[in-house]
Amino acid sequence: MIVKRLFRTMAPVAKHFDYLVIGGGSGGVASSRRAASYGAKTLLIEGKALGGTCVNVGCVPKKVMWYASDLATRLTHAHEYGLAQNVPLSKESITFNWPEFKKKRDAYIHRLNGIYENNLKKEGVEVVFGWAKFNKDGNVEVTKHDNTTEVYSADRILVATGGKPVYPEKVPGFELGTDSDGFFRLEEQPKKVVVVGAGYIGIELAGVFHGLGSDSHLVIRGKTVLRKFDEIIQNTVTDYYVEEGINVHKETNVDKVEKDEKTGKLSVHLTNGQVLEDVDELIWTMGRRSLLGIGLENVGVKLNDKEQIITDEYQNTNVPNIYSLGDVSGRVELTPVAIAAGRKLSNRLFGPEQYRNDKLDYTNVPSVVFSHPEAGSIGLTEDEAIKQYGKDNIKVYTSKFTAMYYAMLEHKSPTRYKIICEGPNEKVVGLHIVGDSSAEILQGFGVAIKMGATKADFDNCVAIHPTSAEELVTMR
């Protein structure tokens, strides 16, 4: 018998569903579509635009901006490849039409929103736009965009509300800055920008701004960026950003922010005493927190000390027939992870018997950073491998070289690879790469590592020449 005790009807209910999904991001959309494909009567509720962070203010528009920035850099290489112009292109001579490009980018995202909605409808998912909240009856009350209210009940409910950016609210003047969401609302390219944060979001945005010609400043608390990644990635990206001319302010933080009301410019005061003057935009990229405020207390769903929904390996919360996944539950916060978890959850809940124990394996999840150059990682860092297996039980292979593309160029971009192996069979437990096309390279090697590949398996693969990736199967 399915949760009639929990979802009792004590308020007028518009409709009852087999499955109700709160949040139309990557995980919610994937789970609702999969459930509907099995015949479940499914409702998806979204407060803003379909696709969530990834499609609207994350992966997709960010990658579009990265392409523009990367192309701007490569255009300056043209004359070194024999492509003559009257005036050789340089970062100073290239102009980027930010407002016009923003229109094209936003139109592309709008098309994707429509594709998401059409795909949901094709699968038979009902979509309601509005803000959902559990009421004290255990049902879901939705305030729609026209300010009308509907109440829905369901046998099973998924919470996939995602996350939102964190602000340093104790810093005087913090509100003068924006966040990574606000980056996509900028109508003009800032001449001078300060990005605060050493995580992948800050690194990507600082790189984009620099590539497009902005005077870019990056403020980090430690000595390196990307501190959750292996040291080969931390050191290579940090050093190259400095070499490229990004102003990396290390071992400091923002003390206060002031605004000149006449010019609109900001003064960003750092804790090391330095003041960054005439700043056009300040962007906080200090992490994200779960997007809550949906009445979880009314149904008793428990949170951890980071205010993330606690789930087990099957995405179950502590309340029967309420589930959670994606950023709001604090697991691996990546779009493909949420999609995979959402599909597996619906397989288990609504699919055939063979999927009754379906769950996502959160180990060996590949991730990339669209820095300049790109970085990719899967498995354990070297420090993690030492802690897990002991230093004497691991072997580390590294390679440092210049990709062929840069052989014709005076200014070289680094390529660094590291393979971490464990035990006498040298099972590959970690792979960390920095260099052009790292994201594309890592996808294939991710399959191999997920299957338990050893160093011998890598060695037995015939190399593709000439490529950078061949180094991974010829490394000694």
Swiss-Prot record:
FAD binds at residues 26-27, 46, 53-54, 62, 132, 327, 335, 465. GO terms for cellular component: cytosol; fungal biofilm matrix; mitochondrion; nucleus; peroxisome. Disulfide bonds join 54-59. Its main location: cytoplasm. Belongs to the class-I pyridine nucleotide-disulfide oxidoreductase family. The active site is a redox-active disulfide bond. This is Glutathione reductase. It comes from Candida glabrata (strain ATCC 2001 / BCRC 20586 / JCM 3761 / NBRC 0622 / NRRL Y-65 / CBS 138) (Yeast). The gene is GLR1.
